[in-house]
C-alpha cells in the first residue's frame, strides 16, 4: 500500500489540465491502487490523479457507505447532463475542512475505461453524479471552490494559510 501526497489548494499544479491515458498498463493500474489506498485512508469518496500531482485522466470514486464499491474511471467523459440541477454541500481532499454548496447537473451519463482498458458507460444521479462531475473538474484544472464567490474563495485561502501556519508551529 502506497499513500500518495495530496496537493492542497491553492497549489497551482491543481490547475493543470490532465492528459488522456494512452495505454492502460501496469503503471496505470498501480496508480489506481495507490490512489484508491490514498482516498480510503484520507478518508474521501473520490480522488483525481491531478490531486496527487499526476496529470493523467484517472479518477477513483467510492460513494458507498461501506467503502466497498470502487469505481475506476480512466479518460472519463460526460456525454450527457440533465437540465435538472441539484445542490450538494461539497468538500475536497485538496481543500481540507472546507465545505460549501455547489450546483451541478442532477443526472449525468459518463463513458470511461476500466483498469483493464475496457470501455464502459454508466448513468449516475445523487452523490455519484456530483462526485463524477467534481473529479472530472479536477482533471480539467478546476477546484470546487472556484464555483463560489470571490469573497468566499478569499476567505477559504486565508483560512487554509492560517491552518498551514499553525501546523508548521506544532
UniProtKB/Swiss-Prot annotation:
CDD domains: Pep_deformylase
Catalytic activity: N-terminal N-formyl-L-methionyl-[peptide] + H2O = N-terminal L-methionyl-[peptide] + formate
Keywords of the record: Hydrolase, Iron, Metal-binding, Protein biosynthesis
GO molecular function, one term: peptide deformylase activity
Cofactor note: Binds 1 Fe(2+) ion.
SUPFAM superfamilies to which the protein is assigned, alphabetical: Peptide deformylase (SSF56420)
Listed GO biological process terms: co-translational protein modification; translation
InterPro entries, A to Z: Peptide_deformylase, Peptide_deformylase_sf
Record carries keyword Iron: yes
Top-level taxonomic group: Bacteria
EC number: 3.5.1.88
CC cofactor: Fe(2+)
Entry binding sites for Fe cation: 92, 134, 138
Record: active site: 135
Record function comment: Removes the formyl group from the N-terminal Met of newly synthesized proteins. Requires at least a dipeptide for an efficient rate of reaction. N-terminal L-methionine is a prerequisite for activity but the enzyme has broad specificity at other positions.
Family: Belongs to the polypeptide deformylase family.
Protein name as catalogued: Peptide deformylase 2
Amino acid at each position: 500500500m502506497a499513500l500518495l501526497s495530496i496537493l492542497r489548494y491553492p497549489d497551482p499544479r491543481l490547475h493543470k489540465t490532465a492528459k488522456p491515458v494512452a495505454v492502460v498498463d501496469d503503471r496505470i493500474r498501480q496508480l489506481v491502487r495507490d490512489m484508491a489506498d490514498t482516498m480510503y485512508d484520507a478518508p474521501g469518496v473520490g480522488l483525481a490523479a491531478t490531486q496527487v500531482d499526476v496529470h493523467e485522466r484517472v479518477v477513483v470514486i467510492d460513494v458507498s457507505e461501506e467503502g466497498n464499491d470502487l469505481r475506476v474511471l480512466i479518460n472519463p467523459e460526460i456525454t450527457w447532463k440533465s437540465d435538472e440541477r441539484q445542490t450538494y454541500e461539497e468538500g475536497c481532499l485538496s481543500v481540507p475542512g472546507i465545505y460549501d454548496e455547489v450546483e451541478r447537473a442532477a443526472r449525468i451519463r459518463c463513458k470511461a475505461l476500466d483498469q483493464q482498458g475496457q470501455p464502459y458507460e454508466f448513468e449516475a444521479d445523487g452523490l455519484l453524479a456530483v462526485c463524477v462531475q467534481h473529479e472530472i473538474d479536477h482533471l480539467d484544472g478546476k477546484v470546487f471552490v472556484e464555483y463560489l464567490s470571490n469573497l468566499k474563495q478569499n476567505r477559504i485561502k486565508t483560512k487554509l494559510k492560517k491552518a498551514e501556519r499553525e501546523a508548521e508551529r506544532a
